[in-house]
């Protein structure tokens, strides 16, 4: 049986739905693109803070399959930012021991970005301080559906094997905590399989504002919770009623 409380020395898997870039910018009279640029700065802050706060795997929701519906100019700007991040952050990631993986579809990304992703993944493959996963053109339901299609050809299947089909990785730790910024309270098709028992933390802070202290607050809340994984809290012997007293 899994422990009710996650040990603080155990490396966590945290997912973050990075929401609120556009609203942050609009409230300041700035373009939505400027909000996304500020969001990249927040990514840098949190990637630096995560290992120091006990996070071993960090999955960031950058672009969902539904985000293609946004205005073309905004989508183009987001793809430019992704290209810029891949080109300019790799050396910093390598220097800090960060291993990068990009999850989601790659066949619909603009020309050159898929190649840049592969190069960044190869360059950071030896990183062991933090496993950074960035979800781009990602849908958890599509990931599960694709895994089910592959599993249909198998004669036997375990939960661990199916999990590898969903995530594309063997031995990936289930998500411990999902954080969503901007005050919205929904998962938006993010990590539905690997986050089945994840704790949820919602904050009013917009993503460009989110910093190490906000991450620490979310983790403090997480560590104060009892995680029962579908079971019951352990009952002490003295709490069990005696038949003689019934």
Question: Where are the regions that the model predicts?
Answer:
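Flexible, compositionally biased loop and terminal segments
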Residues: 1-246
């Amino acid at each position: 049986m899994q422990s009710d409380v996650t040990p603080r020395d155990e490396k966590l898997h945290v997912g973050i739905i990075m929401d609120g870039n556009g609203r942050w910018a609009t409230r300041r009279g700035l373009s939505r693109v400027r909000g996304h640029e500020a969001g990249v700065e927040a990514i840098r802050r949190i990637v630096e803070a995560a290992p120091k706060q006990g996070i071993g795997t960090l999955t960031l929701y950058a672009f969902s399959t539904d985000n293609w519906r946004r205005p073309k100019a905004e989508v183009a700007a987001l793809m430019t930012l992704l290209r810029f991040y891949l080109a300019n952050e790799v050396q910093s990631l390598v220097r800090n021991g960060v291993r990068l993986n990009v999850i989601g579809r790659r066949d619909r990304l603009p020309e050159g970005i898929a190649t840049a992703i592969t190069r960044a993944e190869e360059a950071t493959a030896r990183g062991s301080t933090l496993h950074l996963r960035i979800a781009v053109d990602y849908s958890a339901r599509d990931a599960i559906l694709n895994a089910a299609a592959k599993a249909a050809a198998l004669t036997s299947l375990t939960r661990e094997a199916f999990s590898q089909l969903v995530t594309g990785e063997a031995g990936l730790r289930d998500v411990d905590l999902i954080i969503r910024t901007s005050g919205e309270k929904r998962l938006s098709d993010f990590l539905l399989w690997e986050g089945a028992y994840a704790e949820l933390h919602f904050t009013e802070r917009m993503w460009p504002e989110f910093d190490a202290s906000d991450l620490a607050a979310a983790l403090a809340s997480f560590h104060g919770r009892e995680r029962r994984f579908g079971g019951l809290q352990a009952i002490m012997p003295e709490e069990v009623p005696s038949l003689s007293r019934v």
